[in-house]
Amino acid sequence: MSDLPISTELFNRAMAGNRDAQFELAEIYMQSENDEHVALAEEWALKAAQLGHVEAMYWLGEGYAFYAKDMLEEDPEEAKTYFEHAYRWLEQAAKHKHPAALLELSNFYRRGDVVEKDVTKSVELVKQAAELGEVQAMRDLACIYEHGLGVDVDDEKADYWHDKAQSAEE
């Protein structure tokens, strides 16, 4: 298999279609600096995501978005393709109420990356993520209400989300 800590039992479960084992393999392969292992990480994460593994969906979306941002200046067309992949997987994870995916998806709507810019939808996604416990979304929502970014300024809501974020961090 490789020099990575992959047990035969884990590999066999992944090969048998166990999405949790597939995602675990993806995470192990991703720890390597080897390009072949990184490709295997993507392959196993895709298998897990296609079988409904929500964290794998988010993981792929984040990975594709990161890669797209890196490629933006060098190859805008390739970057766009990866932003589209990122959006698709983040949207899938968001449908399953994955808080971090909702927050990242909000950025696509805020910036207009591969979707039409929609500040209202962006704010709604941040709010959903905050309500699901995503601390960064709580901080973002406090700032949104404090400065009136796509909403009316509302100091009461800003204070509420600021306090909620602080409480969640304790």
Residue locations for each model-derived region?
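Structural signature of tandem alpha-helical TPR/SEL1-like repeats
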Residues: 2-8, 35-44, 70-89, 116-125, ...
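Eukaryotic tandem repeat interaction scaffolds
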Residues: 83-110, 119, 126
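Canonical positions in the second alpha-helix
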Residues: 11-13, 47-48, 91-93, 128-129, ...
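Hydrophobic face of amphipathic alpha-helices that form TPR/SEL1-like repeat modules
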Residues: 24-31, 59-73, 102-111, 143-147
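Alpha-helical tetratricopeptide repeat
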Residues: 7, 11, 19-23, 58, ...
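Short helix-capping/linker turns of helical repeat alpha-solenoids
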Residues: 16-18, 31-32, 51-54, 67, ...
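Residue-level detection of beta-strand scaffold positions
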Residues: 26, 30, 43, 57-58, ...
